Structure formats: structure tokens, C-alpha cells
From Swiss-Prot:
Name of the protein in its database record: GTPase Obg
Gene (UniProt): obg
Domain spans labelled Obg: 1-159
Record's subcellular location: Cytoplasm
Pfam families linked to this entry: GTP1_OBG (PF01018), MMR_HSR1 (PF01926)
Protein role: An essential GTPase which binds GTP, GDP and possibly (p)ppGpp with moderate affinity, with high nucleotide exchange rates and a fairly low GTP hydrolysis rate. Plays a role in control of the cell cycle, stress response, ribosome biogenesis and in those bacteria that undergo differentiation, in morphogenesis control.
InterPro entries in UniProt: G_OBG, GTP-bd, GTP-bd_Obg/CgtA, GTP1-OBG_CS, GTP1_OBG_dom, GTP1_OBG_dom_sf, OBG_GTPase, P-loop_NTPase
Enzyme class: hydrolase
Organism per entry: Hydrogenobaculum sp. (strain Y04AAS1)
Length: 327
């Protein structure tokens, strides 16, 4: 499984350069005053959201990042150069947590958004600062400050307008494929989708992202299966679509499992549930259609039965999603 949605890295900002201890030595001033420049500032460590990144896989091989130190102060009152910042690219949707304090340092939700996670140390003062009427040749200087050093936990939460949530093997991946032309891995066994797949519905003037969330099972909110890993990806979605298999032995129970797991994970997410999509309409049991239609009315939800195999009602579902997003 190459999708990695949590990572731990160490970052070290650059140290500031020390102040210089130098004196002017010019042809006509053999005993010139102090002329040590200040040290340069250390480089900072910056995390930046990049839409071309979709996983933390890069951090499997490199977990320690060090920015450049500032240069020491130079003769003739020349300051040392500042150390270069190091910019680490992460997926859009990355939350950055300081492991030691548990503080959230930043939440990178837009492409190009950046956050300084470790500040470079200030440069030290050269001896030019320490001349006094009674000491014209000071050898005093100050050391550069140490750059910040941190251990960071990175958590990726998928950002999608709509998340398709369902039990394993209900046909979510196939539905995403026919809705968006995304190409998720599809096979006829549970847990084919081991990470969120994203697709895009494009209209004349807008586009909407849809995420196929890996199958949720009973007690997912307690971590059953990969429940907590999966459920966190629905938090940012504007709307949740519940996918229920119309050929299931007990579609009402399937619905109840999904609603319960979402509620127990975060009850505020329930208000995002707007729609039940009945999948596998081509092999549906008639009584299941009736049961889900009745259930949807009781819960004030919309019900749309579809077949990804035959394409029945797929265009209608696209229009429905477009209208939903436009309200």
C-alpha cells in the first residue's frame, strides 16, 4: 500500500552565524578600530502545500531535514550571509502537529500555502558593536542563536467536495469511475480501496471533487479494520453520500451501521449526509428498493438508485451532485 496519510519527521533550522572579531588594517590606519561583521541568520524550515503531492510516501525514505546555518561575521564590517531556507513539499490537506507540545502548527488547505515550522537562529554580533571610549580594540562578540529543532507529526485529511461512504464492496470505486473517469483499483472483494481515491466532475463552468472513502465496517470509530484512518478523510467534505448495495441481505442495517459509525466518530458530520445512493440497481432486490425509498423519506434524505454497470441514472446523479454543490 503506497498511500501514506500519517508521517513523522524531524526538522532543524539553521543556527545563526557568530559575530566576527576583526580589526581594520589599512595602509594608513595600521591600528584601526574593530570591524567584525555580524553573523548571518540561520535558514528556516518551511512546509508548503503542493497539489501534485498526494501522499507522504517521500517521508518513508527521508525523515530528517536540516536548513543551512548562517555564515560567521566577516572583516571590514561585512555581515555573514543568511542560511538558505529549506522548503518541504506536502500534500494539500496536511495538518502539522508539534509532537512535543501537541500543538497544531498549521493546516495547509490550499496549493502554495506555506508555514514556517522551525525558525532559523539570529546571527551574533561582531566586535564592532562593543567598542567603548576606554576599549577601542574589543575582542568581544556574541554567538549566533541556535535554530529551532522539532519533531513533527503530519496528518493528511483528504479535501473533497463530496465523499462517498459505504461498507466494503458496495461498488463505490466503480461509481467513482463512471461519475468522474477516475481510475481506482476495482475488484470483487472487500477492501479493494485501501486509500481515498479522488475524481472530478466537470461542468461548463465549475468542477467538483469526489472522494471514494475506503469501506467502513462496524466499530470503525473504535479503529476496527482501518476505521479511524478512513473516517478522518470525511471530515473536510461538504457533503456525504451513503452508498448502499441494493442486492444486500439487509440494506437498512447497512445504513444504520454507516450512520452509527459516522455519528460516533463525530456527530457533527451527520448534518453533511444528504443522500442515499443505491448501487447495483441492475441486480437489485425489489424489496430493497422499497425499503430504502421509505427509509430515505423518513430521514429526509434523497434516494437515487443507480447502476454503474448499465449506466442507469448515472447522468441524473451527476446533475443532482452539480445542483447540490450549486446551492
Amino acid at each position: 500500500m503506497n498511500f501514506i496519510d500519517i508521517a513523522q519527521i524531524k526538522v532543524k533550522a539553521g543556527d545563526g552565524g557568530n559575530g566576527g572579531v576583526y580589526f581594520l588594517r589599512e595602509k594608513y590606519r595600521p591600528y584601526g578600530g574593530p570591524a567584525g561583521g555580524d553573523g548571518g541568520k540561520g535558514g528556516s524550515v518551511i512546509l508548503q502545500a503542493d497539489s501534485s503531492k498526494t501522499t507522504f510516501l517521500d517521508f518513508k525514505y527521508k525523515r530528517h531535514f536540516v536548513a543551512q546555518n548562517g555564515e560567521h561575521g566577516k572583516p571590514k564590517n561585512q555581515h555573514g550571509k543568511n542560511g538558505k531556507d529549506i522548503v518541504i513539499k506536502v500534500p494539500v490537506g496536511t495538518i502539522v502537529i508539534d509532537k512535543k507540545t501537541n500543538d497544531v502548527l498549521c493546516d495547509l488547505v490550499k496549493h502554495g500555502q506555506s508555514c514556517v515550522v522551525a525558525k532559523g537562529g539570529d546571527g551574533g554580533l561582531g566586535n564592532a558593536h562593543f567598542a567603548t571610549p576606554t576599549n577601542q580594540t574589543p575582542r568581544k562578540f556574541t554567538h549566533g542563536k541556535k535554530g529551532e529543532e522539532k519533531e513533527l507529526i503530519l496528518i493528511l485529511k483528504t479535501i473533497a467536495d463530496i465523499a462517498i461512504v459505504g461498507l466494503p464492496n458496495v461498488g463505490k470505486s466503480t461509481l467513482l469511475l463512471v461519475l468522474t473517469n477516475a481510475h481506482p483499483k476495482i475488484a470483487d472483494y472487500p477492501f479493494t480501496t485501501l486509500y481515498p481515491e479522488l475524481g472530478v466532475i466537470k461542468t461548463d463552468d465549475k468542477s467538483f471533487t469526489i472522494a471514494d472513502i475506503p469501506g467502513i465496517i462496524e466499530n470503525a470509530h473504535k479503529g476496527a479494520g482501518l476505521g479511524l484512518d478512513f473516517l478522518k478523510h470525511i471530515e473536510r467534505s461538504k457533503y456525504l453520500v451513503l452508498a448502499i448495495d441494493l442486492s444486500s441481505e439487509n440494506p437498512v442495517k447497512d445504513f444504520e451501521i454507516l450512520i452509527t459509525e459516522i455519528y460516533l466518530y463525530d456527530k457533527s458530520l451527520i448534518q453533511k449526509v444528504k443522500t442515499i445512493v443505491g448501487t447495483k440497481l441492475d441486480i437489485a432486490k425489489k424489496e430493497n428498493l422499497e425499503l430504502l425509498e421509505k427509509l430515505a423519506k423518513e430521514k429526509s434524505l434523497d434516494f437515487i438508485p443507480v447502476s454503474s454497470t448499465t449506466g442507469q441514472n448515472i447522468e441524473y446523479l451527476k446533475e443532482y451532485i452539480t445542483n447540490l454543490m450549486n446551492h
